Curated annotation (Swiss-Prot):
UniProt name for this protein: Uncharacterized protein MG012
Record GO cellular component, one term: cytoplasm
SUPFAM superfamilies, sorted: Glutathione synthetase ATP-binding domain-like
GO biological process: protein modification process; SOS response
Residues annotated for Mg(2+) 2 binding in this entry: 261, 263
Residue positions binding ATP: 145, 178-188
GO molecular function list: ATP binding; metal ion binding; ribosomal S6-glutamic acid ligase activity
Source domain of life: Bacteria
Binding site for Mn(2+) 2: 261, 263
Nuclease listed as a keyword: no
InterPro entries: ATP-grasp, ATP-grasp_RimK-type, ATP_grasp_subdomain_1, Rp_bS6_RimK/Lys_biosynth_LsyX
Domain ATP-grasp: 115-287
Length: 287
């Protein structure tokens, strides 16, 4: 019998979209006759030797973004899915776009990387310098995002310089600034990739918000990718070094897909609901 450890962050439990994630995995494991054992990140004591850790096998499905913990597990010989490198590549949105920029055939949103301000307030002079750089690089409206964030949080639409300045002044962490894709307002495509294979795609729309996150009230329906689009999603998962992920695309003016961001800890519950299938089955089968 295949045995897999699952490590998750209990801090996410109150979030409604994540409540059924463990149950989804349990249901899949029963169907596949796979033994799963669940651990929170707090259950792992990094002062202990490998032999004293409570794991049932060498494989760990790591449903957290704790890069240091993932790296520690890898250093002790565990196979961690996703790897610490993959999580790091995808969790930092600025780093994700820097990696994708190495591949010109992957169309992505025009993205300006903000300076690292080390959780300090903006120096007024440097804020002016950055705003001028933004204005020289793209026209309003623009999107300001924290390099870290999920569920559409810490994402702001700035219609003019006044809103941009106010938004940046409220940030105490690194941000990226992106051209606003007006033709894709409240609309995106989420593609789920497991082990270099597309296992599902959703078209999400939100009529009341520029963000198309399901957590922000968006609706979703199955989206059918053509072969070229499938290959694009798989290529992105490969260059990001991810075993499984959710890749978000926007629509360009010609309705082609343009890379937005990638989630290394994609939540399968709502996607499974809209696709009427348990996506965790494909994930566990692939491990």
């Amino acid at each position: 019998m295949k045995k897999i450890n699952v490590v998750y962050n209990p801090a996410f439990n109150p979030i409604s979209s994540k409540l059924n994630q463990t149950q989804l995995l349990k249901n899949a494991s029963e169907e596949l006759d796979i033994e799963l054992k669940f651990f929170t990140s707090f259950d792992i004591n990094t002062t202990k030797a490998k032999a004293n850790l409570p794991f049932i096998s060498n494989k760990i499905l790591f449903m957290d973004k704790n890069i240091a913990l993932a790296r520690w597990l890898e250093s002790n010989g565990f196979e961690v899915i996703n790897s610490s490198i993959g999580i790091n590549n995808a969790d930092n949105k600025g780093l994700s776009h820097a990696i994708i920029a190495q591949y010109p055939f992957i169309k992505q949103i025009k993205t300006l990387l903000g300076p690292q301000n080390f959780d300090r307030e903006w120096n007024p002079v440097m804020l002016d310098v950055f705003i001028n750089q933004i204005k020289q690089s793209m026209e309003f409206p623009v999107i300001v995002k924290s390099v870290f964030g999920s569920f559409g949080d810490y994402v702001f639409l700035c219609l003019d310089e006044q809103k941009l300045r106010k938004t940046l002044m409220s940030f105490n962490q690194q941000a990226i600034v992106q051209k606003y894709i007006t033709c894709s307002k409240g609309e995106s495509v989420r593609v789920i990739v497991v082990n270099n294979k597309v296992i599902g795609a959703l078209h999400t729309t939100n009529n009341s918000d520029f963000r198309s996150n399901l957590n922000k009230g968006a609706k979703a329906e199955r989206f059918f990718l053509n072969k070229e689009q499938e290959n694009l999603a798989v290529k992105i998962s490969k260059v990001m070094q991810l075993f499984y992920c959710g890749i978000d695309f926007l629509f360009d003016q010609d309705r082609s897909l343009i890379f937005c961001e990638v989630n290394p800890n994609v939540q399968l519950t709502r996607s499974s609901m809209y696709l009427n299938t348990n996506l965790a089955i494909e994930l566990l089968k692939a491990i």
